[in-house]
């Protein structure tokens, strides 16, 4: 199933869910918001983005934040592809390939050069003799066709693509074009009284026009004896989301006019607060960050610092209120490609569907790529009947919604 059909599948699910609601919830979701804002708060500025990172005009629209507060948001459609740095390389070609000609891998414990030496050492590194990503001639098993990429970049990796290094290409996305994404960013951030692990599908956008994604599903990737290679900038492709970031290494368009002892800004979080590059270990000893990696300074107001890429989590949570899909006016909600099919008058609620099912947005998108509700349910570790019950619809309706899109 290509990206357009995947979006239509999710849209169909959102339509089916409309009668029973799709609100997001979390045990630590904020109960109230802090109405006051720091006088020096850095707010959204279109001028900070690199030329070409934003597609079309930024539109100011009324929006409702997830805590119920009505405000104004900037509706921003990003290019879905970095405009100031080159994507790749990802996988090494052979077991003698050097780090210069390959990307990186991070798994929550460290960042590793994907050179030939790392590939040959995987069995020892992960203490699993099943690992062998290369053939008798020393060539690395790489997903070098679109079919291989789509068969491997999913939770239920096809058997012939296990023990592969997984990489994608722009040409293999729908129409060979980047996947644009529209996000509603509060023009005046509203700090919540408590941190929230909930988020509107992705954590934010970079000043280069790239989605800041949630953590990569490392356990599933390693469980299939695959390496979903990142480039040196911490990004990679998947068929559903296109190019997106899971780690921050300092690439791209940066705003470096911060005060002394501060790192450069590289993006905005979904709640409107700026995101800066990671702090060094030495700098971390001199500051106190909250549970979401944020703090306030006299020059910048409240802002986040990204984790080191090794954490496989650019941000652990959000400290501010954000726009839930379906609560925004203007262009498509977060998670829907600009110009894509509308799910309903409230927009496509990708995170709402995922929240109802108790899975991540990544997991839901990857499961729906299969085009079959029974297969998708198996991937998600449940049954089609259980999914239907949670969504308040029938299994037949679920399958019809997906089947209709695969025949278009």
PLM feature spans:
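C-terminal motif of bacterial Sec signal peptides marking the signal peptidase cleavage site
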Residues: 16-19
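Short, low-complexity, disordered segments immediately C-terminal to signal peptides
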Residues: 21-41
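Mature extracytoplasmic/periplasmic regions of secreted or cell-envelope proteins
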Residues: 32-36, 305, 329-408
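Long, compositionally biased interface segments
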Residues: 38-52, 287-343
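Short helix-loop boundary/capping segments
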Residues: 221-231, 239-282
